[in-house]
Amino acid sequence: MVRSLKKGPFVANDLFKKIEKLNNKGKKKVLVTWSRSSTIVPVMIGHTIAVHNGREHIPVFITDKMVGHKLGEFSLTRTYRGHAKTDKKSKR
């Protein structure tokens, strides 16, 4: 289901405060976060946010086309290594 417009988008408070502080100072810095469920809002455009994928933090540069999506969509948690081969060496 879609979140109610009355409530507004979810953004973690600590992440939002850090971005507001950087915007007031006019600085650009990599922000580290574990909040994959936070929605990208227009205030975040131009910042680089390192999103945790369960093993490491993946830096994500926020552009205007990402607004409305979740941070977790841009740091994949699973690595695809390909299907098993059918040759004789892989059967051993």
Swiss-Prot record:
Taxonomic source organism: Oedogonium cardiacum
GO biological process: ribosomal small subunit assembly; translation
UniProt entry tagged with the keyword Phosphoprotein: no
Subcellular location: Plastid, Chloroplast
Pfam families registered for this protein in UniProt: Ribosomal_S19 (PF00203)
Name the record gives this protein: Small ribosomal subunit protein uS19c
Gene3D superfamilies linked: 30s Ribosomal Protein S19, Chain A
Summary of the function given for this chain in its UniProt record: Protein S19 forms a complex with S13 that binds strongly to the 16S ribosomal RNA.
NCBIfam families: rpsS_bact (TIGR01050)
Cellular-component GO terms for this entry: chloroplast; mitochondrial small ribosomal subunit
GO MF annotation terms: rRNA binding; structural constituent of ribosome
SUPFAM superfamilies the UniProt entry points to: Ribosomal protein S19
Family: Belongs to the universal ribosomal protein uS19 family.
Keywords, alphabetical: Chloroplast, Plastid, Ribonucleoprotein, Ribosomal protein, RNA-binding, rRNA-binding
